[in-house]
Amino acid sequence: MNIPATGKDFMIVNMGPHHPSMHGVLRLIVTLDGEDVIDCEPILGYLHRGMEKIAENRTIIQYLPYVTRWDYLATMFTEAITVNGPEQLGNIQVPKRASYIRVIMLELSRIASHLLWLGPFMADIGAQTPFFYIFRERELVYDLFEAATGMRMMHNYFRIGGIAADLPHGWIDKCLDFCDYFLTGVAEYQKLITRNPIFLERVEGVGIIGGEEAINWGLSGPMLRASGIEWDLRKVDHYECYDEFDWEVQWQKEGDSLARYLVRISEMTESIKIIQQALEGIPGGPYENLEIRCFDRKKDPEWNDFDYRFISKKPSPTFELPKQELYVRVEAPKGELGIFLIGDQSGFPWRWKIRPPGFINLQILPQLVKRMKLADIMTILGSIDIIMGEVDR
């Protein structure tokens, strides 16, 4: 006998941390009245690794391999912000060629991140076919990364004052070929997805956020731009050499899950435009500021010196962070990724506060899912785009 659920007879359900749609180790405690969501409480911290404290016990160069583990699907952005802070504190000039290569890598990383958001998002909604097409394109981006950096993920490619290595011979032509191919791929996704009536039914009008509400919650990235706010740090902060390229900020005014999807799809085509312009106009010259190598360098050990046997153990070149405070930020695929850095006249930062976009964007989830159906939780959570590595840090 089925007893209808009344207002007093709520059901409490645990979603996660092993649920296939939870995008990592996220747990939601959901209170249900039948199919309607009454309340939702996210439980975080399953992937906490003490990243801020580790930073305070490492030099910047030693810490660089760690930062790729925050948002492990868009690692170029975490590397960029880690080197941008010391560069600003130390007034270190980045060569033009290195800046162009950084922009190319950042935009490729943005495309890879958006693709890896789109595939599982479609699978959560019930569309399996686009998932395989999307991963085919993402594989090509990872091939480009592997050719340039040696790694498909966790690239460890950015350095203070430049990058680790120049682009290999033939890489630029290969990347231009990918850009032409990918534009046809995006058109294919839009044919498959954007006007699909079942897809529209699942996302249109679901999880609406108004512009003022988005600002009050501190949202950033596609979450903010989908609510009618034209705010992109690449235009606002003028970092790297984005001002030298012709591109537009992508935004929508509806504020629902469909608008967030459209913003990300449009951003991928804008990223291709930026990459094509950067590849065609890439200047010659050095790919790193060679003066950085001379920081804090002890005299070279001599043949008969006791220290000579430890030559392979010599510390990495580093420099003292001046006694200053600095907040530095970049426009990551998920929003504003920032670091509040306090130097203390030593090689280690005194404080290293990470502002992860996913953590702040996730805070609005309980408000968005209230009074919605249980099945809408997947759509709304998927449209926020979170990675638990950077949420829990």
UniProtKB/Swiss-Prot annotation:
Catalytic activity: a plastoquinone + NADH + (n+1) H(+)(in) = a plastoquinol + NAD(+) + n H(+)(out); a plastoquinone + NADPH + (n+1) H(+)(in) = a plastoquinol + NADP(+) + n H(+)(out)
GO biological process: photosynthesis, light reaction
Topology class, membrane: Peripheral membrane protein
Pfam families with a match to the protein in the record: Complex1_49kDa
Compartments reported by the entry: Plastid, Chloroplast thylakoid membrane
Disulfide bonds: none
Alphabetical keyword list: Chloroplast, Membrane, NAD, NADP, Plastid, Plastoquinone, Quinone, Thylakoid, Translocase, Transport
Gene3D superfamilies xrefs: Cytochrome-c3 Hydrogenase, chain B
GO CC, one annotated term: chloroplast thylakoid membrane
HAMAP family, per database record: NDH1_NuoD (MF_01358)
Protein role: NDH shuttles electrons from NAD(P)H:plastoquinone, via FMN and iron-sulfur (Fe-S) centers, to quinones in the photosynthetic chain and possibly in a chloroplast respiratory chain. The immediate electron acceptor for the enzyme in this species is believed to be plastoquinone. Couples the redox reaction to proton translocation, and thus conserves the redox energy in a proton gradient.
PANTHER family linked: NADH DEHYDROGENASE [UBIQUINONE] IRON-SULFUR PROTEIN 2, MITOCHONDRIAL, NADH-UBIQUINONE OXIDOREDUCTASE 49 KDA SUBUNIT
Family, per entry: Belongs to the complex I 49 kDa subunit family.
Name this polypeptide is given: NAD(P)H-quinone oxidoreductase subunit H, chloroplastic
Organism: Carica papaya
Gene: ndhH
